[in-house]
């Protein structure tokens, strides 16, 4: 069964190691066969992989596009271990990602890592907000005069 992919004008898609860019109008592609496929919006470049979760995503992306889990296995394991040390509460998400990798479904692991990125942003935002709170526990607002 063919995979149907609709592309917006000028949208890019990676099929295997080839980048395909659409022209000026919408297009529908039917792709048959086994190839790694990622839309432009699902790709994180090396320069964008600045957070631990995004680095995990980037390594999974390399595994998927290169079709070579072994070449990137050590980097993946090291990144996962470091993330778990820093945020043990992420275990349910990490577990799902690693289960997909173990079963060979790297595409689903990539999709599950989007949840990890969202979680990382949530806890980072919470920590930054917490750091800005006054040490006395107040919310920083002065009481209004009656």
Model-derived features: positions:
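C-terminal charged interaction modules
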Residues: 81-146
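Short acidic/polar alpha-helix capping motifs at helix-coil junctions
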Residues: 3, 26, 43-44, 58-63
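Short, surface-exposed, low-complexity cationic segments
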Residues: 22-50
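Feature detects long, helix-prone N-terminal segments enriched in hydrophobes
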Residues: 10, 48-53
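Short, intrinsically disordered/low-complexity patches at protein termini
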Residues: 38-39, 44-46, 54, 63, ...
């Amino acid at each position: 069964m063919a995979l149907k992919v609709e592309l917006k004008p000028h949208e890019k898609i990676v099929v295997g190691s080839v980048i395909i860019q659409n022209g000026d109008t919408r297009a529908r592609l039917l792709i048959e066969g086994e190839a790694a496929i990622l839309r432009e919006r699902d790709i994180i470049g090396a320069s964008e992989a600045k957070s631990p979760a995004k680095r995990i995503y980037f390594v999974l992306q390399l595994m998927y596009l290169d079709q070579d889990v072994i070449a990137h296995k050590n980097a993946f394991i090291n990144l996962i271990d470091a993330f778990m040390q820093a945020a043990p509460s992420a275990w349910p998400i990490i577990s799902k990602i690693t289960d997909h990798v173990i079963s060979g479904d790297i595409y689903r692991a990539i999709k599950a890592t989007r949840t990890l990125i969202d979680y990382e942003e949530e806890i980072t935002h919470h920590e930054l907000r917490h750091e800005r709170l006054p040490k006395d526990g107040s919310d920083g607002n002065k009481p209004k005069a009656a």
